[in-house]
């Protein structure tokens, strides 16, 4: 059991018969009344995001999850195949289970597979990934590094807002939690 006062981003907990990852949390101490913790949680089985409020000091069960390092191989219809680089064991995950993460996956990319009691429940992406711009409007002379942005389509199909100086073929660092441009690679 862990106190909600000890929440950290990325912590995995068991609440309401589900396995949840803490995406965001905020300790609130109102002027009148007891303190509480407002949190934003993602269900690791369904991908649903829910906001939940806990009383200060409330205890929740910490989920015992295992992470296995695997490489993303390919898409096979609606399933996606991953391989353990040590044992060469392959597993398939359905597209709807990892829909958000697919926007950042490239072939042969190393990621962590999240396992709970022997069941594969999702994947854990790195904080940032490097992706190549496949389509964007050309930069115009006079564009500066400050002010304004334009949409750019990346090699995985993800569309992000980028500064005007970014061109097709540029390799960018993308934040996976916010699906946002960070810098050029």
UniProtKB/Swiss-Prot annotation:
PROSITE patterns: EFP (PS01275)
Name under which the protein is recorded: Elongation factor P
UniProt keywords, alphabetically: Cytoplasm, Elongation factor, Protein biosynthesis
Subcellular location: Cytoplasm
Keyword Cytoplasm set for record: yes
GO biological process, one term: peptide biosynthetic process
InterPro entries per record: Elong-fact-P_C, NA-bd_OB-fold, Rib_uL2_dom2, Transl_elong_fac_P/YeiP, Transl_elong_KOW-like, Transl_elong_P/YeiP_cen, Transl_elong_P/YeiP_CS, Transl_elongation_fac_P
One Gene Ontology cellular component: cytoplasm
Family: Belongs to the elongation factor P family.
CDD domains in the cross-refs: S1_EF-P_repeat_1 (cd04470), S1_EF-P_repeat_2 (cd05794)
Protein purpose: Involved in peptide bond synthesis. Stimulates efficient translation and peptide-bond synthesis on native or reconstituted 70S ribosomes in vitro. Probably functions indirectly by altering the affinity of the ribosome for aminoacyl-tRNA, thus increasing their reactivity as acceptors for peptidyl transferase.
Any GO MF annotation of the entry: translation elongation factor activity
Gene source species: Listeria monocytogenes serovar 1/2a (strain ATCC BAA-679 / EGD-e)
Lineage, top ranks: Bacteria, Bacillati, Bacillota, Bacilli, Bacillales
Gene: efp
Metabolic or biological pathway: Protein biosynthesis; polypeptide chain elongation
